[in-house]
Amino acid sequence: MNTLSYKTISANKATADKQWIVVDAEGHNLGRFASKVAMLLRGKYKTSYTPHVDCGDNVIVINAEKINLTGNKLDEKTYIRHTGYPGGQRSLTAKVMQQKNPALLVEKAVKGMLPKNKLGAQLFRNLNVNVGDAHKHAAQTPKAVNLNDLK
């Protein structure tokens, strides 16, 4: 019996098989979509997944303006930020944010589902969200993935 075959293989930056993936946001619900994109960024669908390493894929999201928000979330969901000055709390509804910058709506949802540490910041840099179906990463020959096929 070969005992070397029972070693646990841990991925590192050099051995991570990172690919470029295009995902279409049209017709998807925001939270469910963001959850699957976060799993792709994290690399959890790969057999070589290692929790402390950036072994996920680079994800390009297209048609960010066509994402769905269910129920009354478009009018009632608020995004709160603070300027840093006293009394500087500002808020936007999802409807206003979708009109101003629909890509930011998807980015905030995905970022909230990534780890809140250095690794999460590094993983978030692998996300590219685009309004419309055009993107500037054609040179990387990204592979189109249907999120309905993923669990």
Question: What is the predicted role of each segment?
Answer:
Residues M1-E107, K118, K136-K151:
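Ribosome large-subunit tunnel/peptidyl-transferase-proximal elements
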Residues D133:
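Flexible, active-site-proximal loop/turn residues at the rims of small-molecule/cofactor binding pockets
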